[in-house]
Amino acid sequence: MLQEILSSALLMLIMIDPSDKILLVSLLREDFHIEDVKSLIIRANIIGFLLLLIFAVAGKIILQDIFHIELDALRVAGGFVLFKIGLEALESGGMVTIKKEKNILALAAVPVATPLIAGPAAITAAITLTAEYGIVVSVTATFIAIVITAVLMLLSLYLMRGINKTALSVTIRIIGLFIMAIGAQMMISGAGGIVLSILKEA
């Protein structure tokens, strides 16, 4: 079970993708007090975990029984969103800027907790991990990934200050390319599952 938890936590961490959250923190650090940014990070990750917990426990019921959405369709949608985010990072060397708020904590739930932390890719992963390994592995892996994400975001408050903006832009573009590849793979996997499902019914 330990190996399943660790591999699942790695998958969830990739789906959450702390890299763009770290960039967000560096941008917010320039305009807001560091203590406010810390509070934002903690609140956003708690909210993000609770959202993923809901989908890990009851996501299949919510999606398939209520909305009649198949997991493969969600994989395609999540992959498309990831591909789009990666493409934006690759082209611009940055992420879409968030409209400034007078109260930074207003950003904790939306857009930081969702869709940045608990986005389509992470939600898909939570549901898929529950289906494949069970609720204990899925929730534990999600918790580990969220803790790592929160720690990286908090550390970036201090580490990102000395990084050259040009180097940061290049790094973001490279990360964007990998995000695009992950998104493309998710879309291919989801589309393949949809095709197989259609062939079985035919």
Curated annotation (Swiss-Prot):
> In the UniProt record, does the keyword Zinc-finger occur?
no
Sorted UniProt keywords: Cell membrane, Membrane, Transmembrane, Transmembrane helix
Superkingdom = Archaea
Transmembrane domains' residue ranges: 5-25, 47-67, 76-96, 104-124, 135-155, 174-194
Its topology with respect to the membrane?
Multi-pass membrane protein
NAD: is it a keyword of this entry?
no
Q: Where in the cell is it found?
A: Cell membrane
Q: Which family does it belong to?
A: Belongs to the UPF0056 (MarC) family.
Q: What is this protein called?
A: UPF0056 membrane protein PYRAB02000
UniProt organism field: Pyrococcus abyssi (strain GE5 / Orsay)
- Tell me the classification of the organism that encodes this protein: Archaea, Methanobacteriati, Methanobacteriota, Thermococci, Thermococcales
